[in-house]
């Protein structure tokens, strides 16, 4: 037999005395608050000692507009009172007297047959006043039995609002009666406080036993945001592989974001519809000395490489943008640390002028990895891609030839998830022109991917926007993979 608390026993005793079903909200017991009663009845229900039924009820409340009508009178009532007093009322006078409710008045009076003739409303009786007064009374008492008035004001909209509530009906059952008859622990101690200690009641009074199997309310868990957790996991993988983390800037010059990576100045990616440009004249471009090298290689190339053969614009290079990729961070880092070997990575935000939908965002995280070493080749690129994606849990991957303006050869990474293939990122080896611009003495292999698209697979989502929504059920219940 389940143990019950003193409050639960008081509820059972109260229900036994009533010997009938009663609304939980009508239970009144001295010394117990509404919260105490609700808690005790909930536990009695869980223990099977009372029967609980739920009845859905509908009530109506006044909106702000309805409250104004209840206090000041309905528009048609006030207008009809003026009309009754004057006998006639021009539409112009009505509009001046009630400018905000003019149309409402005309619509409601028309239902009683009072319509303007030659721009004038004329008084008419015919029990109109009684009907309008009935409407006014309804706003005062909100009688739910007056279905006609309810339908009338629901059609008018924004006067009354429907509210649904669940009413709990409780009654004691045979198990509860048996429990009550056997209950002899009204003085059992269920909670230690200073009074129990100072009175030394604990020496003689029995203690209520702990029920370790009693059901409890689920505890809400509060942990790191799923994206923060996932970013840390990506960092851990890179660091375990011996990589060094780097960081860059949200705002970059086109010189570094585009030109240093040998992207021509007429490339479609530079268009306003693809890139966010920033208006600012107080921005210092890092390592401006690289400009001469960029200009020469873009225009004329170098031994064995022809360049783009156009007139490179210094003004275009100085334009400021929100970085479109984190490869700009790789380029600058290698320019500043051009001794090999280097293994570097970053997980930072980039910005694209994208239309936001289920798989695209205008602001998102990009995972960037790069290795600078004399032994870099397509074979080592394929090996490190399989190793990296394998640590993310993707065992089946395919590398597909692709094109990127600053790598050659270039490969797309295609993974298999639940029997379906999905492109997850791009990779390649820096073009010789990029290495020449950066002053590198060995090849560089690099790869990158959008973090959010990867997180969608990791957390089983179908819409990338869900990662940024305030859906507490997802934030509290997302599962971590080990």
From Swiss-Prot:
Binds 2 magnesium ions per tetramer. Disulfide bonds: none annotated. One of its GO terms (biological process) is phenylalanyl-tRNA aminoacylation. Mg(2+) binds at residue 408. It comes from the Archaea. Gene3D superfamilies: Bira Bifunctional Protein, Domain 2 (3.30.930.10), Winged helix-like DNA-binding domain superfamily/Winged helix DNA-binding domain (1.10.10.10). One of its GO terms (molecular function) is phenylalanine-tRNA ligase activity. L-phenylalanine binds at residues 327, 366-368, 406, 430. One of its GO terms (cellular component) is cytoplasm. The keyword Oxidoreductase does not apply. Its EC number is 6.1.1.20. Its cofactor is Mg(2+). It catalyses: tRNA(Phe) + L-phenylalanine + ATP = L-phenylalanyl-tRNA(Phe) + AMP + diphosphate + H(+). InterPro entries: aa-tRNA-synth_II (IPR006195), aa-tRNA-synth_II/BPL/LPL (IPR045864), Phe-tRNA-synth_IIc_asu (IPR004529), Phe_tRNA_ligase_alpha_bac/arc (IPR022917), Phenylalanyl-tRNA_Synthase (IPR002319), WH-like_DNA-bd_sf (IPR036388). Keywords: Aminoacyl-tRNA synthetase, ATP-binding, Cytoplasm, Ligase, Magnesium, Metal-binding, Nucleotide-binding, Protein biosynthesis. It is found in: Cytoplasm. Belongs to the class-II aminoacyl-tRNA synthetase family. Phe-tRNA synthetase alpha subunit type 2 subfamily. HAMAP family: Phe_tRNA_synth_alpha2. Tetramer of two alpha and two beta subunits. This is Phenylalanine--tRNA ligase alpha subunit. It comes from Thermoplasma volcanium (strain ATCC 51530 / DSM 4299 / JCM 9571 / NBRC 15438 / GSS1). The gene is pheS.
